[in-house]
Structures are given as structure tokens and as C-alpha cells.
UniProtKB/Swiss-Prot annotation:
Presence of keyword Metal-binding: yes
Binding site for Mg(2+): D51, E163
Catalytic activity reported: deamido-NAD(+) + NH4(+) + ATP = AMP + diphosphate + NAD(+) + H(+)
Broad EC category: ligase
Gene this protein is translated from: nadE
Binding sites annotated in the UniProt record for ATP: G45, I46, S47, G48, G49, Q50, D51, S52, T158, K187, T209
Keyword Zinc set for record: no
Gene Ontology BP terms: NAD biosynthetic process
GO cellular component, one term: cytoplasm
UniProt name for this protein: NH(3)-dependent NAD(+) synthetase
Covalent S-S links between cysteines: none
Molecular-function GO term, any one: NAD+ synthase activity
Length: 272
């Protein structure tokens, strides 16, 4: 088995999918998991990007079906901007599409800035822009878990195969969640699910960005990665990609393995 095939298997990628079938499977997963855990529903941060839009709509469909079947579940969508988000219109469009039971907004700026100032005062140096970006992601995680803990809700994560293969998420930030309904999907497959669900094309054709950096606001994921999502998707779907691209992907996969595992102990062998 080639490394490409090993990665596809590890990340549960299917080269060809039926969007209707995938939607059904993922809604059922959300329903089954919330019932099994005894939780009261879900909470998810909504950025206005493709991934949170898709996960949010799946979550809302799941809780509606649970209620229609005589159960009780709620979905809360939470906006988590840092000051003014330049694509706020997209976030509002996403909320209109998702139609969450409840939605709220929590500006993380005062929390992030207070932490950054305290860090500088105590340690005598400023956080790098990259590290501050990770703090933003982790404050967002803390906020979602505060809401979830207060209301008995599970935190949904938006990680999918194209992020997982590169480790393109913040450890214990956007990587911190209770369940991952998008696991196994490539970026283009996620777009196909949104199309099937009737989303405005603006929500899945926009340039993907983590938007965590103050010095490079709105920087494209592809710029930061040095790899395009089409290349990642082709690789994950078992297609041929240029040798240098495959090498980049495989290197990122190897060095980011710790992000896809629980914290290492001396009894684990995945890190050896």
C-alpha cells in the first residue's frame, strides 16, 4: 500500500461520493451521537466559510429531526469575530442559510487583547502574530465549551480530510471539539454537499481563509499552505499529482501527526 493509499484510508476518504447519501449519513451520526451521550444538542462557531456553514446546517437538520421524532435537542450557532470581520456579510448569509434554533455573537477581541497584554507584561515580549492567531482560535474553543458546558451541548468541529492531511488547524483551538461531522470529506466534496443542500454559491465558492493573522488579514489558506485545495483533493481522492506536491502533502501529514492524536504517553507508539 502506498503512502497515499495509507493516508486515504486513515482519513476515511472515498474518491467518489453521493452528496445525498453523505448528508443522510452525517445527519444520522449527529443524531446518534447526541442521543448516546445524553447531551441536549450542539454548539458551533460560524465564520461564514464553507466548513462551518456545512456543519451548521447538518447540525440544524439533526436537531429538527430529533424533535420531529419526539426528542428534544437544540442547536446554537455562535459568531466569534475578532473586532470587525471584513466578510461579516458572508457570516450573516451563512446564518440565514443554517437557520439555527438560536444564534449569538461573542467578540473575542477584549479577551485576546487582555491576554496578549498580560503575556507581554509578565514575559517581556510580544506574542508573534502567528502565536496570537492560535490564541484567537483557542479563545474561540473556550467560548464554545463555556456555552456547551452551561447548556449541556456538544461542541461541533469542522475538520475535514483536506485540513486533517495537512494539520491545518490549531491544536486545542479549532481542533478542539466533541465530534466531527465532516470527517472524510475533501474540500470539493464539502462544496457538493452544500450545493445539494441549496446553499448560496457565495458560501462555497469564496476563497478559504483561517483569517487569524493581524498582519495578513484574510490571507488565503492556499497561500499559507503553499498547496491548492484542488491539489489536496486530487491527492486525497487517489489521483496523480506532481511529485513535488505529493512530497509537500506527505511531509505535512507526517509532521502534523501529533495533531491527530491524543496527547502522547510512554505507552503510545504512534510517535516513535
Amino acid at each position: 500500500m502506498t503512502l497515499q493509499e495509507q493516508i486515504m484510508k486513515a482519513l476515511h476518504v472515498q474518491p467518489v461520493i453521493d452528496p445525498k447519501v453523505e448528508i443522510r449519513k452525517r445527519v444520522d451520526f449527529l443524531k446518534d451521537y447526541v442521543k448516546k451521550t445524553g447531551a441536549k444538542g450542539f454548539v458551533l462557531g460560524i465564520s461564514g466559510g464553507q466548513d462551518s456553514t456545512l456543519a451548521g446546517r447538518l447540525a440544524q437538520l439533526a436537531v429538527e429531526e430529533i424533535r420531529n421524532e419526539g426528542g428534544n435537542a437544540t442547536f446554537i450557532a455562535v459568531r466569534l469575530p475578532y473586532k470587525v470581520q471584513k466578510d461579516e456579510d458572508d457570516a450573516q448569509l451563512a446564518l440565514q442559510f443554517i437557520q439555527a434554533d438560536q444564534s449569538t455573537a461573542f467578540d473575542i477581541a477584549s479577551t485576546v487583547d487582555a491576554f496578549s497584554n498580560q503575556y507581554e507584561n509578565l514575559l517581556g515580549e510580544s506574542l508573534t502574530d502567528f502565536n496570537k492567531g492560535n490564541v484567537k482560535a483557542r479563545i474561540r474553543m473556550v467560548t464554545q465549551y463555556a456555552i456547551g458546558g452551561q447548556k449541556g451541548l456538544l461542541v461541533i468541529g469542522t475538520d475535514h480530510a483536506a485540513e486533517a492531511v495537512t494539520g491545518f488547524f490549531t491544536k486545542f483551538g479549532d481542533g478542539g471539539a466533541d465530534l466531527l461531522p465532516l470527517t472524510g470529506l475533501t474540500k470539493r466534496q464539502g462544496r457538493a454537499l452544500l450545493q445539494e443542500l441549496g446553499a448560496d454559491e457565495r458560501l462555497y465558492l469564496k476563497m478559504p481563509t483561517a483569517d487569524l493573522l493581524d498582519e495578513k488579514p484574510g490571507q488565503a489558506d492556499e497561500t499559507e499552505l503553499g498547496i491548492t485545495y484542488d491539489q489536496l483533493d486530487d491527492y486525497l481522492e487517489g489521483k496523480a499529482v506532481p511529485a513535488d506536491v505529493a512530497e509537500k502533502i506527505e511531509k505535512r501529514y507526517t509532521v502534523s501527526e501529533h495533531k491527530r492524536q491524543v496527547p502522547a504517553s510512554m505507552f503510545d507508539d504512534w510517535w516513535k
